[in-house]
Protein backbone atom coordinates (compact mmCIF):
# COMPACT_ATOMS: atom_id res chain seq x y z
CA UNK A 1 0.00 0.00 0.00
CA UNK A 2 2.77 2.40 0.92
CA UNK A 3 4.61 1.54 -2.30
CA UNK A 4 1.50 2.27 -4.35
CA UNK A 5 1.05 5.62 -2.64
CA UNK A 6 4.71 6.48 -3.16
CA UNK A 7 4.53 5.59 -6.86
CA UNK A 8 1.34 7.62 -7.27
CA UNK A 9 2.98 10.52 -5.45
CA UNK A 10 6.09 10.41 -7.64
CA UNK A 11 3.98 10.30 -10.80
CA UNK A 12 1.95 13.23 -9.49
CA UNK A 13 5.05 15.30 -8.75
CA UNK A 14 6.43 14.55 -12.21
CA UNK A 15 3.15 15.54 -13.84
CA UNK A 16 2.90 18.71 -11.77
CA UNK A 17 6.45 19.63 -12.65
CA UNK A 18 5.69 19.14 -16.32
CA UNK A 19 2.78 21.58 -16.05
CA UNK A 20 -0.03 19.06 -16.26
CA UNK A 21 -3.20 21.03 -16.95
CA UNK A 22 -5.52 18.23 -18.07
CA UNK A 23 -8.91 18.66 -16.45
CA UNK A 24 -10.68 15.47 -15.46
CA UNK A 25 -14.37 15.49 -14.80
CA UNK A 26 -17.44 13.32 -14.78
CA UNK A 27 -21.08 14.04 -15.46
CA UNK A 28 -23.96 12.74 -13.41
CA UNK A 29 -27.19 12.61 -15.38
CA UNK A 30 -30.68 12.09 -14.10
CA UNK A 31 -32.68 9.94 -16.48
CA UNK A 32 -35.58 9.29 -14.14
CA UNK A 33 -38.79 11.14 -13.47
CA UNK A 34 -37.84 11.93 -9.88
CA UNK A 35 -34.99 13.87 -8.25
CA UNK A 36 -31.76 12.12 -7.33
CA UNK A 37 -29.35 12.90 -4.52
CA UNK A 38 -25.60 12.57 -4.94
CA UNK A 39 -23.38 12.71 -1.86
CA UNK A 40 -19.58 12.74 -1.63
CA UNK A 41 -18.04 12.05 1.76
CA UNK A 42 -14.55 13.25 2.65
CA UNK A 43 -12.70 14.28 5.77
CA UNK A 44 -13.03 18.08 5.85
CA UNK A 45 -9.92 20.23 5.96
CA UNK A 46 -9.81 23.89 7.04
CA UNK A 47 -10.79 26.12 4.15
CA UNK A 48 -8.23 28.69 3.11
CA UNK A 49 -9.37 32.28 3.08
CA UNK A 50 -11.17 33.05 -0.15
CA UNK A 51 -11.15 29.45 -1.37
CA UNK A 52 -13.59 26.58 -1.55
CA UNK A 53 -13.75 23.99 1.24
CA UNK A 54 -11.06 21.34 1.05
CA UNK A 55 -11.58 17.62 1.52
CA UNK A 56 -8.97 14.95 2.17
CA UNK A 57 -8.41 12.26 -0.45
CA UNK A 58 -5.81 10.40 1.63
CA UNK A 59 -4.57 11.08 5.16
CA UNK A 60 -4.03 14.86 5.21
CA UNK A 61 -0.33 14.61 6.01
CA UNK A 62 2.05 11.77 5.19
CA UNK A 63 5.73 11.48 5.91
CA UNK A 64 7.91 10.28 3.04
CA UNK A 65 11.65 10.28 2.28
CA UNK A 66 11.03 13.45 0.26
CA UNK A 67 9.46 15.17 3.26
CA UNK A 68 5.90 16.06 4.18
CA UNK A 69 3.26 16.30 1.51
CA UNK A 70 -0.49 16.68 1.49
CA UNK A 71 -3.11 14.79 -0.43
CA UNK A 72 -5.87 17.35 -0.75
CA UNK A 73 -8.56 17.79 -3.33
CA UNK A 74 -10.88 20.72 -3.95
CA UNK A 75 -14.21 19.83 -5.47
CA UNK A 76 -15.70 22.26 -7.95
CA UNK A 77 -19.26 21.76 -9.13
CA UNK A 78 -20.53 23.07 -12.46
CA UNK A 79 -24.28 22.54 -12.43
CA UNK A 80 -26.07 22.34 -15.77
CA UNK A 81 -29.34 23.73 -14.50
CA UNK A 82 -30.17 24.27 -10.88
CA UNK A 83 -28.62 22.08 -8.20
CA UNK A 84 -28.61 22.33 -4.42
CA UNK A 85 -25.22 21.80 -2.81
CA UNK A 86 -25.18 21.15 0.93
CA UNK A 87 -21.83 20.85 2.72
CA UNK A 88 -22.25 19.37 6.20
CA UNK A 89 -19.91 17.18 8.22
CA UNK A 90 -17.56 16.61 5.31
CA UNK A 91 -20.35 15.71 2.89
CA UNK A 92 -21.06 17.46 -0.38
CA UNK A 93 -24.66 16.66 -1.21
CA UNK A 94 -26.15 17.59 -4.55
CA UNK A 95 -29.84 17.30 -5.34
CA UNK A 96 -30.70 17.23 -9.03
CA UNK A 97 -34.16 17.71 -10.46
CA UNK A 98 -35.31 15.54 -13.37
CA UNK A 99 -33.61 16.13 -16.73
CA UNK A 100 -30.71 17.96 -15.09
CA UNK A 101 -27.09 16.96 -14.89
CA UNK A 102 -24.05 17.97 -12.88
CA UNK A 103 -20.44 18.22 -13.99
CA UNK A 104 -17.84 17.84 -11.26
CA UNK A 105 -14.14 18.50 -11.76
CA UNK A 106 -11.31 18.16 -9.30
CA UNK A 107 -8.02 19.92 -8.67
CA UNK A 108 -5.05 19.02 -6.53
CA UNK A 109 -3.00 21.45 -4.52
CA UNK A 110 0.56 20.42 -3.68
CA UNK A 111 3.17 22.61 -2.02
CA UNK A 112 1.02 25.67 -2.65
CA UNK A 113 0.88 25.07 -6.41
CA UNK A 114 -2.48 24.09 -7.83
CA UNK A 115 -2.38 21.61 -10.67
CA UNK A 116 -5.05 19.60 -12.45
CA UNK A 117 -4.28 15.94 -11.89
CA UNK A 118 -5.31 12.59 -13.33
CA UNK A 119 -5.89 10.48 -10.23
CA UNK A 120 -8.50 10.76 -7.53
CA UNK A 121 -10.44 8.43 -5.31
CA UNK A 122 -13.97 9.04 -4.14
CA UNK A 123 -14.18 7.19 -0.85
CA UNK A 124 -17.96 7.05 -0.91
CA UNK A 125 -20.44 7.84 -3.62
CA UNK A 126 -24.09 7.64 -2.70
CA UNK A 127 -26.80 8.08 -5.31
CA UNK A 128 -30.50 8.05 -4.50
CA UNK A 129 -32.98 7.82 -7.34
CA UNK A 130 -33.65 5.16 -9.96
CA UNK A 131 -32.41 5.72 -13.48
CA UNK A 132 -29.34 7.75 -12.59
CA UNK A 133 -26.22 7.21 -14.64
CA UNK A 134 -22.63 8.33 -14.41
CA UNK A 135 -20.58 9.25 -17.50
CA UNK A 136 -16.84 9.62 -17.08
CA UNK A 137 -15.34 11.97 -19.62
CA UNK A 138 -12.27 10.71 -21.39
CA UNK A 139 -12.32 7.19 -19.96
CA UNK A 140 -15.39 5.93 -21.84
CA UNK A 141 -16.65 4.36 -18.63
CA UNK A 142 -20.33 4.44 -17.80
CA UNK A 143 -21.88 3.17 -14.59
CA UNK A 144 -25.64 2.78 -14.50
CA UNK A 145 -27.41 2.98 -11.15
CA UNK A 146 -30.67 1.07 -11.30
CA UNK A 147 -31.21 0.61 -7.57
CA UNK A 148 -33.14 3.23 -5.63
CA UNK A 149 -30.09 3.98 -3.52
CA UNK A 150 -26.71 2.53 -2.57
CA UNK A 151 -23.09 3.21 -1.71
CA UNK A 152 -20.44 2.80 -4.39
CA UNK A 153 -16.67 3.13 -4.50
CA UNK A 154 -15.34 4.77 -7.65
CA UNK A 155 -11.69 4.89 -8.64
CA UNK A 156 -10.22 6.12 -11.90
CA UNK A 157 -6.92 7.41 -13.19
Model feature map: region roles:
Residues 1-19:
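Sec-dependent bacterial lipoprotein signal peptides
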Residues 20-31, 35-157:
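Intrinsically disordered, low-complexity segments enriched in small/polar residues
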Amino acid sequence: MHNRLLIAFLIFVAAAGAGCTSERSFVIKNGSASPIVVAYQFAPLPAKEGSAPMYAMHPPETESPEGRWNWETRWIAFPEGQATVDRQQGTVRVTLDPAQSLRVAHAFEYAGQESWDFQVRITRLTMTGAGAQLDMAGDQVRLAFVESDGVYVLEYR
